Amino acid sequence: MLKAYIKACYIKGILRKQVPVSFDKKNKLSFLDAKPLTADKVYCVINFDDLSPLPDNSKFIGRGGSLEDFVSIKQMELLKLFPFIGITHFMIPQFLPSDYYYIFNKQRYSILNAANKEWLSYYKTLAANFNIEFASHGVYHRQAENLLFARHTEFAYLDYERSLQRLTHSISLFNKAGINPIGFRAPGWDMNSDISLVDAVSAAGLKYAGLSSYDGGLNSTRQRISYYHPVMLKGIVNFPDNINIDWPLDKIKTTIRNIVDMNGIIAVKGHFSKHILTNSLSEENFLKLIEIIKFIRAEYKGTIEFATFKDVYTKLEDGKLSVSNNTELKLQ
């Protein structure tokens, strides 16, 4: 409590910045009255944060930047085993892994860098052959407004105008690479405390966002939005993150059963990195992901359909989703 208070005082008093939503316990804004959206079946979306041209053989934590990286190889194994799954990658189009790259080499890990042309071509071909979607994960995955902590929260200190500019820049980078994202997830979950990032996402022309986990993003400090259903929010659809691949398998299975009972959406989320990062695609979690898919196929074939977030949004746009009458299940 004291640590958070000191940080908030530093942000407001020294930096003269708006306190991010993760520090703003006075913010009572809630979207819990937003009607849950459901479909005639439950969709399971496997999704990863942080795909970028940053390889394992750099001095940083790799993000699938080489075709020989562990996560790249394991992803291909997964697609060969289960070609029917959908994967949404929240991609970083111009990753800056340290401050050095702000000053000296901002294009090094850009998807537009000619040095990364083969990597980009590989992933675009992969998306053409399998059900893979690329969505925006900001531009840099790094913020320079607060140099002391939470450097990975790119949108934490950006107001509406700067958030919109950053999102527009992100979309432009993707478009130049031949990718047309319709979705977004904020790096590090955090956002400005007035939650105008939601308005910026809508104004940028994006169709959906993943802005909430159980305790991150819109659900920082208190629950503001559904844990288990997509909801319409200021002109965009919010998809929750509700299963992490580093959870115990029994907990994952129990959560899947609960979500199926509520006719919600199953969002199985990880980081596209081999190790160190929380919830990463390690060997252990890769094997667990295989077991998750097998479990769903064995117990819910015909009930659960694998998809990308874009697929589920398209169902909504086509009018195939409806308002749910289910009561929201509270997190235990």
PLM regions and their residue ranges:
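Generic enzyme active-site microenvironment
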Residues: 47-48, 135, 306
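Active-site-adjacent pocket scaffolds in enzyme catalytic domains
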Residues: 2-35, 110-114, 176-275, 318
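Well-ordered, non-membrane alpha-helical segments in soluble/globular domains
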Residues: 64-76, 109-121, 160-168, 249-254, ...
